[in-house]
């Protein structure tokens, strides 16, 4: 096996503790020692990934595949929403009051708070 891909929620991170267990850290470490590249694969955008603790991995596929980066910073894939589409969407949300969240590689933005985003 050359590579292994792991989801975060319920796979690497416990639904009960919201943390990565020591046994998971140890197992991932052993994979890497055996020469297996370890990747995180998640639907979350990077700003929402904050609970991996001391887990070491080689790369991350985030935002449902829109962003793929190695831990050394190498960008493998980065799909951006076209600026004109983003402007049309924000105008629509302003005209029809609704919350929408956007995320970049470094930050997330919410146009207005609602119970869904609090």
Language-model features and meaning:
Residues 2-17, 42:
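Asp-based phosphoryl-transfer active-site loop
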Residues 20-21:
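A short acidic/small-residue loop/turn micro-motif
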Residues 25-117:
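Active-site phosphate-binding/coordination module
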């Amino acid at each position: 096996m050359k590579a292994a891909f792991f989801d975060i929620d319920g796979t690497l991170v416990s639904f009960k503790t919201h943390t990565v267990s020591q046994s998971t850290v140890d197992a991932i470490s052993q994979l890497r020692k055996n020469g297996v590249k370890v990747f995180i694969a998640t639907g979350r955008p990077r700003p929402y990934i904050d609970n991996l603790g001391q887990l070491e991995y080689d790369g991350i596929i985030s935002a449902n595949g829109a962003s793929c980066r190695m831990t050394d910073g190498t960008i493998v894939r980065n799909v951006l929403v076209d600026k004109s589409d983003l402007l049309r969407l924000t105008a629509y949300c302003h005209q029809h009051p609704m919350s929408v969240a956007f995320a970049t590689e470094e930050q997330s933005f919410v146009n207005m708070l609602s119970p869904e985003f609090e």
